[in-house]
């Protein structure tokens, strides 16, 4: 089953995941600075992406520029992948294509563990 078909309740029961909802979890982390290029890009892209009103537009025009900026801020020490097959365990339904993957490895040819984030640009 592709990742997009999982529901939160199912993930909790099948994989023994515990949810922890905490207010202010990142409150102590200082605000990140970002480049003028990202600011200008988002200033133009966000209204356009919202007007187009699709997952693809939000993914390409909002999420991708932010993740590229993140990679730049880490001096390319993290891997960034888009639209890649990420089959972990097909028997347990852990397979499919992810909008974005971030890896702790700077390797760009192969997705290497650990994967530190999965990002999906979903319509809610």
What spans do the regions from the language model cover?
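Terminal, non-catalytic protein-protein interaction segments that mediate quaternary/complex assembly
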Residues: 22-25
């Amino acid at each position: 089953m592709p990742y997009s078909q999982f529901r939160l309740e199912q993930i909790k029961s099948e994989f023994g995941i515990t949810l922890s909802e905490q207010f202010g979890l990142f409150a102590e982390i200082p605000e990140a600075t970002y480049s003028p290029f990202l600011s200008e890009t988002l200033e133009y892209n966000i209204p356009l992406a919202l007007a187009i009103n699709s997952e693809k537009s939000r993914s390409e025009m909002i999420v991708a520029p932010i993740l590229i900026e993140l990679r730049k801020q880490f001096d390319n020490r993290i891997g960034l992948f888009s639209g890649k097959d990420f089959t972990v365990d097909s028997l347990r339904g852990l397979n499919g294509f992810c909008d974005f993957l971030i890896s702790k490895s700077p390797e760009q040819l192969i997705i290497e563990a650990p994967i530190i984030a999965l990002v999906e640009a979903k319509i809610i």
